[in-house]
């Protein structure tokens, strides 16, 4: 998620996320999910409740809230016309993208709403401000982007300082292959016109959203780590379930830097070797190159934003 205004946007977007949640949950007073609260001095209300299974949010410079809905292959545009905190106007901004192609990533940048799915990276405009895109341009084509078969197909996209950053995760849980075997598990960069493809970082399993740390040029993201850390041990003792895998490895909050290697699938968390690759001849060398996470989170928590 991109936060252009470091003073207010983090709170605005965080509250908006809660406001548009529309999954079937226990609802408390005024439609707020039970257990959801905000700090003293803040107030939480429902801004829009009709969008089902929203994914990511983005604001433009006129206050329009865009909501990606991957299972519908569409983006909705929400407008608060009277300033009361609720969105009276809901339109379909773009539609017709295959649900299996996972339209999710969005960013408003230099007058255009950029978005991405498995087929490409696009930029769009609503020149007459009616809530519907009247111009959509494919900037980066499918032939330039990582292949998208298998799992972890959520394309991340970030634009900063006129550079496009994009990532698609590992096609399996932990694919053992040479680093440059394919374009996945990496962050790639492009110029704003789609030219100049360049490698930025490697060893990334599945970072579904890339962010700029407010007030800096730093690129951050949460990487969702593997699901079978203890497989070789636990499969021999099925009656014990998954005592290792249920709690390991941690999800990683990473600061992504140019040329950085982030360990996947061989090195996990704070330089812990993947138990499934203990016989790999380059394990120690890869550990020496691994960029240590800035922070670790509980296993399988799948954090974003």
Regions found by a protein language model. Give the residues of each.
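Beta-rich, blade/repeat-based domains predominating
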Residues: 50-62, 96-112, 116, 146-163, ...
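A detector of repeated loop/turn-to-beta-strand junctions in beta-rich toroidal repeat architectures
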Residues: 72, 87, 118, 133, ...
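Short loop/turn segments immediately following beta-strands, especially the blade-tip
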Residues: 78-85, 124-132, 258-262
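Beta-propeller domains
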Residues: 66-86
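A short loop-to-beta-strand structural motif that recurs across blades of beta-propeller domains
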Residues: 74-77, 120-122, 186-188, 252
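Beta-propeller domain segments
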Residues: 30-40, 154, 171-174, 185, ...
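Conserved beta-strand positions in repeat-built beta-propeller and related beta-rich domains
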Residues: 59, 67-71, 115-119, 166-171, ...
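Asp-box/WD-like beta-propeller blade repeats and closely related beta-sheet repeat scaffolds
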Residues: 90, 101, 119-160, 170-172, ...
């Amino acid at each position: 998620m991109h936060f252009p205004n470091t003073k207010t946007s983090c709170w605005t977007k965080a509250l908006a996320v809660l406001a548009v949640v529309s999954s079937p949950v226990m609802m408390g007073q005024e439609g707020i999910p039970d257990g959801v609260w905000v700090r003293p001095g803040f107030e939480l209300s429902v801004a829009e409740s009709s969008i089902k299974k929203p994914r990511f949010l983005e604001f433009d410079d006129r206050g329009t809230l865009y909501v990606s809905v991957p299972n519908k292959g569409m983006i909705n545009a929400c407008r608060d016309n009277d300033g009361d905190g609720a969105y009276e106007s809901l339109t379909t901004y773009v539609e017709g993208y295959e649900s299996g192609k996972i339209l999710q990533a969005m960013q408003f940048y230099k007058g255009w709403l950029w978005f991405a799915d498995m087929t490409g990276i696009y930029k769009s405009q609503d020149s007459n401000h009616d809530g519907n895109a009247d111009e959509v341009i494919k900037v980066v084509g499918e032939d330039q982007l990582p292949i998208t078969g298998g799992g972890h197909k959520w394309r991340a996209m970030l634009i900063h300082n006129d550079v496009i950053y994009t990532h698609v995760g590992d096609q399996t849980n932990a694919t053992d292959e040479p680093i440059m075997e394919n374009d996945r598990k990496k962050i790639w960069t492009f110029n704003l016109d789609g030219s100049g493809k360049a490698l930025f970082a490697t060893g990334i399993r599945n970072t579904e959203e890339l962010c700029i740390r407010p007030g800096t040029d730093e690129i951050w993201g949460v990487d969702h780590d593997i699901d079978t850390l203890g497989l070789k041990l636990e499969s021999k003792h099925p009656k014990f379930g998954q005592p290792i895998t249920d709690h390991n490895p941690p999800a990683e909050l990473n600061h992504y830097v140019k040329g950085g290697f982030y360990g996947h699938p061989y090195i996990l968390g704070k330089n812990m070797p993947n138990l499934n690759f203990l016989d790999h001849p380059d394990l120690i060398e890869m550990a020496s190159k691994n960029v240590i996470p800035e922070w670790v989170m509980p296993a399988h928590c799948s954090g974003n934003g």
